[in-house]
């Protein structure tokens, strides 16, 4: 009899249901709500003693509520004698605060979150496309960071784009974009943003010939969509025939939907690590792919003590 059990909070129950469907097991029974003063309440409604528990809970908006749900659930499972607790965090919030720039008086919030997850008794963490790989080093427990690129690459291949070119929207994303370009066997372009003079707007230098090409911008997340929309504009101005964007995490905060609708971006393709808002679902230029099969396979391998890296060879 399998000891694996999968539970979820309120962050992304649809993804959790898709994952257990892939694993051919039922979704675990846990009640997660709030007390009248807004504090998180949780109760496990079935026996988990000796079980291999997986909690699927991205820490997306509302970030603090979803993070506290994860922490409180983990404590409940630990106190209920689960043999192992794995936090499956498809989107890891607070990941962008991972350093102190020039000794500024700021928190390293990614480290704070790592400490919180460890101290409540979580044994292992599974993430998808961490914003910065070094965050794995903030944990004193094993962290498996899997990639959304296979899902994105499969869809790009299915679209049968002509004269294709993968483009990194900034220098920081070159490694990710190069890996996608290599998988597809196509050219790589890079957008180098730089401010020539103080108080002047950024200038986008295009590295690579995009004239007449179908350009695909690749990034780990799309937040306000400002960078992608400006990049799409620069590519079109340099002669690109079409510009698409493929991003794993659809954060889509602030005026993101408005920015996308008013841009020259032909389409934004994302995964379901984060659920789309009603406005995002209604936007004809946004399409969502299912990452559940990849997450489910990683969960299965962890539970069976199999290699995770073998998934991406």
From Swiss-Prot:
Which organism encodes this protein? Pseudomonas syringae pv. tomato (strain ATCC BAA-871 / DC3000)
NCBIfam families xrefs: PRK01259.1, ribP_PPkin
Where D-ribose 5-phosphate binds, per the record, is at: 195, 219, 223-227
What is known about its subunit structure? Homohexamer.
Task: Extract the SUPFAM superfamilies matched here.
Answer: PRTase-like
GO molecular function list:
ATP binding; kinase activity; magnesium ion binding; ribose phosphate diphosphokinase activity
Q: Keyword Acetylation on this protein?
A: no
In its UniProt entry, what is this protein called?
Ribose-phosphate pyrophosphokinase
Name the catalytic site residues.
193
Give the InterPro entries listed for this entry: PRib_PP_synth_CS, Pribosyltran_N, PRibTrfase_dom, PRTase-like, Rib-P_diPkinase, Rib-P_diPkinase_bac
Residues that hold ATP according to the record: 37-39, 96-97
The record's function comment reads:
Involved in the biosynthesis of the central metabolite phospho-alpha-D-ribosyl-1-pyrophosphate (PRPP) via the transfer of pyrophosphoryl group from ATP to 1-hydroxyl of ribose-5-phosphate (Rib-5-P).
Q: What detail does the entry give on cofactor binding?
A: Binds 2 Mg(2+) ions per subunit.
Keyword annotations for this protein, in alphabetical order, are: ATP-binding, Cytoplasm, Kinase, Magnesium, Metal-binding, Nucleotide biosynthesis, Nucleotide-binding, Transferase
A GO CC term?
A: ribose phosphate diphosphokinase complex
Its EC number(s): 2.7.6.1
Cofactors named for this entry: Mg(2+)
Amino-acid positions noted as binding Mg(2+) 2 in the UniProt annotation, renumbered to this chain: 170
Q: Which reaction does it catalyse?
A: D-ribose 5-phosphate + ATP = 5-phospho-alpha-D-ribose 1-diphosphate + AMP + H(+)
Q: What class of enzyme is it?
A: transferase
To which pathway does this protein belong?
Metabolic intermediate biosynthesis; 5-phospho-alpha-D-ribose 1-diphosphate biosynthesis; 5-phospho-alpha-D-ribose 1-diphosphate from D-ribose 5-phosphate (route I): step 1/1
């Amino acid at each position: 009899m399998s000891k694996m059990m999968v539970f979820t909070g309120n962050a992304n129950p649809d993804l959790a249901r898709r994952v257990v469907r892939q694993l051919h097991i039922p979704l675990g029974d846990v009640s997660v709500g709030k007390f009248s003063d807004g504090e998180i309440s949780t109760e496990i409604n079935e026996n988990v003693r000796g079980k291999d528990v997986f909690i699927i809970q991205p820490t997306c908006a509302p970030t603090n509520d979803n993070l506290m749900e994860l922490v409180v659930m983990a404590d409940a499972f630990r106190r209920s004698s689960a043999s192992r607790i794995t936090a499956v965090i498809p989107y890891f919030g607070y990941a962008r605060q991972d350093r102190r720039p020039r000794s500024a008086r700021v928190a390293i919030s990614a480290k704070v979150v790592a400490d919180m997850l460890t101290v409540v008794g979580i044994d292992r963490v599974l993430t998808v496309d961490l914003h910065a790989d070094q965050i794995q080093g903030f944990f004193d427990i094993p962290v498996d960071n899997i990639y959304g690129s296979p899902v994105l690459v499969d869809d790009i291949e299915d679209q049968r784009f002509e004269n294709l070119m993968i483009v990194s929207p900034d220098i920081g994303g070159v490694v990710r974009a190069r890996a996608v370009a290599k998988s597809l066997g196509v050219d790589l372009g890079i957008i180098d943003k730089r401010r020539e003079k103080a108080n002047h707007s950024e200038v986008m230098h295009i590295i690579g010939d995009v004239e007449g090409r179908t350009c695909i911008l690749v990034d780990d997340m799309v937040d306000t969509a400002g960078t992608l929309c400006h990049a799409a504009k620069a590519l079109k101005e340099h002669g690109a025939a079409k510009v698409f964007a493929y991003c794993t995490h659809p954060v889509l905060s602030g005026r993101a939907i408005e920015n996308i609708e008013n841009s020259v971006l032909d389409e934004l393709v994302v995964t379901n690590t984060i659920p789309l808002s009603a406005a995002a679902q209604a936007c004809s230029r946004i399409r969502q792919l299912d990452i559940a099969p990849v997450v489910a396979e990683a969960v299965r391998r962890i539970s069976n003590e199999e290699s995770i890296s073998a998934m991406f060879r």
